[in-house]
Amino acid sequence: DCTMRISYAATLTADAKMGDTDNPNEVVLTWKRTNTTYFDTLKDCCHVYTYGIDVLKQFSDSGGNLRNVKFRLHNDTDDVFVIAEQKDGVYYAKGFAAKKSDATTFVPNSSGHIVVKGLEDDTYSLTETATDKSYVLLKDAVKIVIKTAESGQCEKCGTKLLTASATVNGKDATMTDGNAIVPLTVVNNPGFDLPKTGGYGTWMFTVGGVALLGAAAFIVVKSRKHKSEQ
């Protein structure tokens, strides 16, 4: 006797079912031995599940230009960056990259949404890499966890069926569209960062300058008030 391994690869299309609705894939192998008159048949099936995220980008003062906002998505489970292609306003994952420079840059659409489909049940980090001028960049990456649990068996082949759940930064998220999409919102606030590129001395000099300006303003106001009283 001998063992033969047959491998094949399949690609999920944009029409793939998402969430708890699986994509069944059945394989039937038929072969005949040279010393027999009958055929042997082997059947196997698998159920593929796929998920997505819907990021809503907002500015706290309803200002800001969404086109200046950029995100990067990292698969923490496999330690790779997500590569995706955009079609009709939706990003579809098509592969992974080991280097950060090769990762896809995700930009919100006109309504502020970034929809990414074709993700596995893994742990992801969503990092904001750029935002509009005069707004504070998101400090920490958003941690997204998509996990599955057994929910039964396929009556036809006995394969385990799955149901999904998700958390965002450790808090339970209510998935939409039959546990297909993880919704989350990222908000930027107006603000500025003091320059620190010159080192500790330069930063302290900047802070000191601001303090001196405040003192000068106080002195001017106090002086004017004193003169008006005279």
What are these regions, as identified by a protein language model?
Residues 1-230:
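Solvent-exposed loop/turn and edge beta-strand elements of beta-rich ligand-binding domains
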